[in-house]
Amino acid sequence: MKIHLLKMSEQQPTDYAFPEKARRASNTSAPSQKRRDQEDLNRRPSFFGRVPAIVWSGAMAFVLAVGTGGIWTVLLTSNLATSPAIPWSVAVMALFLWTMWQYLGGRWWPRSTSQARRRYLRARSLPGRVFAWAVAAGLLSTIALVGYWIVLLQVVKIPTRVLPNFFSYPPLTAILVLIMASLVSSLAEEASFRGYFLGTLEQRMSGPVAIVIAALLISPGHSLTQGFLWPIMLWYFFSDVTFGAMAYLTKSILPSALVHSIGLLIFFTLVWPYDAQRRQIWETGANTGFWIAAVSAIIFTVLALLAFIQLALVAKQRKP
């Protein structure tokens, strides 16, 4: 009995007997989330250390977006000039876009970069509620942007963009070309700028700053086709901020890619073909169409902002 009691006394006291000591030990052995966040922040490189990654990512995004559009332009021009009845350019471009999307999403060589490519593309599926609010916010913004565009062309003198009259070609060619034209710019821009580039920026700075930088970088790309005019660049800046906000809040480019494609299809068919007919208000006065566009732009801007607020709430709720 004495031997047993002696052994019991030689054992180290348990932490249950000293709760304060156990709590201190727990705090020292498992750093708090705040401390881990601070340590992660301290490990981040300085601003000059971040620049190379940002520069390379931005350059890649710009080349990919502009280059993809250039490839489509060459294919389409050749197709319409040689055999407009057979829309072979659409098939070739579809294969190119599929290959691009697969590679950016992590397929094929090199395997060592597969996970990184998949992560940076950010083509993640979303819960139905988050996806629905993201699409709603994007579509409401698109309607507002249509109104602002119509108002802009009647307030500021801007050289109008002359588009090919696709409806003068065979119906099948016209329909397929318009659909592909809407997909080319949207998929390339969303993958490169709202996927790779914005994802890189978000790791190194706040979300709003990252959205603005990404929108500023793509502006010259839009100006290559629309002209280097400040009203046009400002309009495109806000449209790019819209898509950037969708990608930032959802951490996915799927909603913005869908809305971007729908928006381009609307502009290709209902807006841009009629730009040449719009006259400045100081020449003809503000007609009914002008006021409808102006009021619609304001109303749908408010609705879009409310939808984005709701999107931010539902997106935050799904995070663990």
Predicted segments — roles?
Residues K2-R44:
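Low-complexity, intrinsically disordered extramembrane tails and loops of integral membrane proteins
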Residues I54-Q115, W133-A134, V295-I298:
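Alpha-helical transmembrane segments in multi-pass membrane proteins
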Residues V55, A59, F131-A136, I175-I179, ...:
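Hydrophobic alpha-helical transmembrane segments
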Residues V66, P231-A286:
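Functionally important transmembrane alpha-helices
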Residues L75-I86, Q115-A188, Q203:
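Juxtamembrane helix-loop-helix connectors linking adjacent transmembrane helices
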Residues A188-I213, Y248-S252:
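Membrane-interface helix/loop boundary segments of multi-pass membrane proteins
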Residues H222-W230:
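Membrane-interface helix caps and helix-loop-helix hairpins in membrane proteins
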Residues S261-P320:
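C-terminal membrane module of polytopic membrane proteins
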